Structures are given as structure tokens and as C-alpha cells.
């Protein structure tokens, strides 16, 4: 249904219930520290580290959680995989007050993941799987216009990791 006619057709008041819909990169980050980044990893080498911390990252999680903590009504719109990482993202975002109704499970794409290698000074290097968000297209957004119509604004990032959207940018 066209959101421009939703109010007239349904008698609904199109009050903006969501302050911001966060779209795009939605990631599970695995923080590995300390890693001596100045030394090549090399084959067969064991690096002893602190316990690996698993958290969320990407613009959807980072900005979404920050906005929710500022008492904004926010929602996530992205693809996740059909895997355990998707469950972790959904739980973390839900626990932080981010609406996850529009986190879409992609049938073939994996949830985006990153190994974040951190040295003693805080410098970071990344090993990243873009995963399902790279499969987002203009249709992914157009098919959810009713959801976006409930929002005051949207924030999309990172375009370079979503190549199927680049051709649709002005």
C-alpha cells in the first residue's frame, strides 16, 4: 500500500511513531586484544589474548543504541543472516530499546561480522565480512515504505559496503 494514501484509506492518524530508522551496516564485532599489529601474523603462530569480547557494531547498532539511550524511538532496517549471529544482534538491539521489526532475515546472506584486532595503544585493524547488508537494494527500502512512513527521518550507512544501492544515489 502506498504510504501517501495509508492515512486516507485506513482512517489511521499517520503520527510519526519512530524518530529515526537506522539502515545499512549491522554487524557482530569480535574484539581481540591485545594484538601486536606491528608484527606480521604469519602462518601457524599463536597469539595469546584477553578474552574475546563479542558485541555489535556498524551504523545500525552504534547509532541506534546511542539514539535509544538518548530516549529517542529508533528502529533498525537491515539484512541479517539465518544464523546465530543474527540472534545476538536482535537480542542486543532489543535489550537497548531499538525496534527490530524491520531486521530482515536474508535467505542466503550471512550476518555481517568483523574481527577487530586491537593493540595496546588502541589502534585497530579489521577483518570484515560485509555479509547480507551488501545485498540490500532499492527494493529492500521500497517494499517497506509503510514502515518508513512512521518515521521522522532515516540514517543510511555505509554506502560503500552496499554496492547495490550506489547506482540509485543522486
Residue positions per predicted region:
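Glycine-rich phosphate/adenosyl-contacting loop at the front of the ribokinase-like
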Residues: 2-79, 84-98, 151
Amino acid at each position: 500500500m502506498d504510504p501517501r494514501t495509508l492515512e486516507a484509506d485506513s482512517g489511521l492518524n499517520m503520527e510519526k511513531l519512530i524518530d529515526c530508522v537506522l539502515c545499512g551496516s549491522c554487524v557482530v564485532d569480535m574484539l581481540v586484544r591485545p594484538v601486536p599489529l606491528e608484527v606480521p601474523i604469519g602462518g601457524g603462530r599463536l597469539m595469546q589474548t584477553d578474552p574475546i569480547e563479542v558485541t555489535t557494531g556498524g551504523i545500525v547498532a552504534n547509532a541506534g543504541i546511542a539514539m535509544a539511550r538518548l530516549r529517542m524511538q529508533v528502529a533498525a532496517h537491515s539484512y541479517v543472516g539465518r544464523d546465530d549471529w543474527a540472534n545476538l544482534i536482535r537480542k542486543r538491539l532489543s535489550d537497548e530499546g531499538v525496534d527490530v521489526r524491520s531486521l530482515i532475515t536474508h535467505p542466503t546472506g550471512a550476518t555481517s561480522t568483523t574481527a577487530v584486532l586491537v593493540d595496546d595503544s588502541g589502534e585497530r585493524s579489521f577483518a570484515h565480512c560485509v555479509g547480507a547488508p551488501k545485498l540490500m537494494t532499492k527494493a529492500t527500502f521500497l517494499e517497506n515504505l509503510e514502515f518508513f512512513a512512521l518515521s521522522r527521518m532515516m540514517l543510511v550507512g555505509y554506502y560503500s559496503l552496499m554496492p547495490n544501492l550506489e547506482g540509485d544515489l543522486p
